[in-house]
């Protein structure tokens, strides 16, 4: 208990989107480390459908801000799979929590990875004595392919319903990447913007960022 309380470890835990693997962020991590005197370690975990986990990489004892990427064998789309992935991620997080004894972390989710993080934070985060400091979602379709808030997906309705379970000290950034001002061709901008109905007023702060151009 004392060791966890005094821990300096603050991992950045990333979840890729549908059809992506635990290798999704390799390029970004390499670029991040290229101009840093102090390199971030990279631990990659693949959660198999049978519950087993494959670990690759390591976290050094002196690394206070390692990057952990969690991918899934079941990386398909759809609300039922998002819930399955959140449940499997919880099992993975429990192992990380016991093994590394951290008391806080930062969260990044790309596309459906942001949905998995949101589902986890609403349903499982209270199980851990951890401060979830920041959540950044990148192009996460909170209303799936719907173009309008007039038609809410079941997932969005549930996320809004259970948003009171979100950590109240969480800082959230929602990034919408668009080639035009309407849609990036894959995720409707309105679907990303729907995140505000989940987070505003429920977390410490919520900021939506729209990136346009190349």
Q: What is each residue range found by the language model?
A:
Residues 1-108, 112-214:
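Lipid deacylating catalytic domains
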């Amino acid at each position: 208990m004392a060791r966890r309380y005094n821990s300096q470890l603050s991992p950045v835990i990333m979840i890729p989107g549908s059809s992506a693997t635990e290798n999704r962020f390799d390029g970004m991590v390499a670029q991040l480390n290229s101009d840093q005197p102090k390199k971030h370690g990279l631990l990659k975990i693949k959660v198999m459908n049978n519950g087993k986990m494959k670990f690759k990489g390591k976290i050094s004892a002196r690394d206070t801000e390692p990057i952990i990427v969690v991918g899934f064998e079941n990386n398909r789309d759809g609300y039922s799979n998002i819930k399955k992935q959140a449940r499997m991620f919880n099992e993975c997080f429990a192992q990380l929590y016991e093994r590394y004894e951290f008391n806080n972390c930062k969260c990044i989710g790309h596309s459906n990875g942001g949905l998995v993080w949101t589902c986890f934070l609403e349903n499982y985060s209270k199980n851990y004595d951890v401060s979830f400091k920041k959540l950044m979602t990148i192009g996460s379709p909170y209303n799936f392919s719907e173009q309008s808030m007039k038609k809410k997906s079941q997932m969005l309705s549930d996320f809004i319903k259970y948003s009171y379970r979100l950590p109240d000290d969480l800082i959230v950034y929602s990034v919408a990447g668009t080639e035009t001002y309407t849609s990036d061709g894959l995720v409707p901008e309105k679907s990303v913007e729907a995140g505000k109905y989940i987070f505003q007023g429920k977390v410490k702060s919520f900021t939506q960022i729209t990136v346009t151009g190349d």
